[in-house]
Amino acid sequence: MASPGKPGADEAQEEEGELEGGSAGPRAAILEQAEELFLLCDKEAKGFITKHDLQGLQSDLPLTPEQLEAVFESLDRAHTGFLTAREFCLGLGMFVGVASAQGANPCRTPEETFESGGLDVQGTAGSLDEEEEEEERFHTVLEQLGVAPVLGKQRAVRTLWARLQRERPELLGSFEDVLIRASACLEEAARERDGLEQALRRRESEHEREVRALYEETEQLREQSRRPPSQNFARGERRSRLELELQSREQDLERAGLRQRELEQQLHAQAAEHLEAQAQNSQLWRAHEALRTQLEGAQEQIRRLESEARGRQEQTQRDVVAVSRNMQKEKVSLLRQLELLRELNTRLRDDRDACEARRAGSSCRKALTTARLPGPTCCCCCCWARPPRRGSGHLPSAR
C-alpha cells in the first residue's frame, strides 16, 4: 500500500529514464529551490501545502492565479487537494528535468531534505514503512468501527486521525464516535440518494416507453395519413390528441427533473444539518461529561462531609456518655460524702449532748454542796438550773 502522493513504479521508472542524464550540480540547485518554495508556501509547518498556499506566492512569482492553479493541478496527480514535500519536489523535477532516484542512486529524497537535511535512503525506507503501518492501523480501526466502506478513502479523516493519535490520543474515542455517527448519516443519505435515483430511473424508463409508444402511434398515423382522405379526419384528431399527450408527458418529465434537483438539494441540506447536529451532539456530550465529573466530585465531597459529620456525632455521643458516667460517679460520691457527713453530724450531736449532760450533772452536785453550807435560804431552785441552749433541741435533765 503506497502512501499519499507517492508516484507509482511506472512513473518512477519514467522519471528516472527522463532525468537519468542530469548532473548532480543542477539537481542539488533545483532541490534547494524546491525546498525554498515549499517552505515559503508551508508557513504553518503543516508538512503539506494546498492550492491556497501556492497562490500565496503570487507576489513572489511572475505568475497569475490561474497559472498557479494550473501548476498545482498538474502537480496534484492523486487529486487529494494537497501536496506533500515529496510530490512537490518530484513535480518540479518533472518540469525542470531533475528528480531524485529511488533505486540505486544514494541521493536524498525531497521530503528528507525538508525534514532532516541529512538522512539517507535507509531512513526514507523506514519513514515509508512507518507511514504504511499507520495506514494499515487506520484501515484496521475503520474496519473495526464498520465505517471503512464510507470513510476509507477520505484523506482528511486519515490526516486528522493520525494527528489526534500523535498529539491528543485521549480524544480518539470521541473522534471514533463522531466517525460512526457521520458514517451512519452518510449511509442514510446514500440510501436516500439511491432510492431517488432508482425512482428517477424507473420514471425515465416509463417515460421512454410512453414516448416510444407515442412515436410508434405517430408513425402509424403518418402511415395512415397516406391512405384515402375519407379516413384522415378521425386519424388527424387522434394524432393531435397523441401529440398533446406527448407534450404533456414531456412537461411531466421536466417537472420530474426539477423535482429531482429539488430533492437532491434537500438531501445535501439534510446531510449538512446531520453533520451540524453531530457536531452539536459531540459538544453536548463533552459538556455532559464535564458536568458528570463535577457531579461525581460534589457527591464524593458530600459523602466525605457526611462521614465526618457521623464521626463527629458519634464522638459527641461518646463524650456525652462519658460525661454522664462521670456525673453519675460524682453524684454517688457526693451522696456517700453526704451520708458520712450526716453520720458524723449525728455522732457530734450525740457527743455534744453527752458533754452537756455531764456538765449539768456536775452543776447539780455543786449546787447541793452549796445548799448544805449555812447561808440564806432560797425557795427558788432555778438558780442552779442552766437555761436551755438555743438550737440544741434538748432540755437539761433536772436532778
Curated annotation (Swiss-Prot):
Residues 181-358 form a coiled coil. Disulfide bonds: none annotated. Residues 1-25, 216-239 are annotated as: Disordered. Residues 216-226 have a biased composition (Basic and acidic residues). Gene3D superfamilies: EF-hand. InterPro entries: Ca-binding_regulatory (IPR051111), EF-hand-dom_pair (IPR011992), EF_hand_dom (IPR002048). Residues 33-61, 67-95 form the EF-hand domain. GO terms for biological process: store-operated calcium entry. Keywords: Coiled coil, Phosphoprotein, Repeat. SUPFAM superfamilies: EF-hand. It comes from the Eukaryota. The modification Phosphoserine is found at residue 3. One of its GO terms (molecular function) is calcium ion binding. Belongs to the EFCAB4 family. Plays a role in store-operated Ca(2+) entry (SOCE). PANTHER family: CALCIUM-BINDING PROTEIN 8 (PTHR46311:SF3), CALCIUM-BINDING PROTEIN 8-RELATED (PTHR46311). This is EF-hand calcium-binding domain-containing protein 4A. It comes from Homo sapiens.
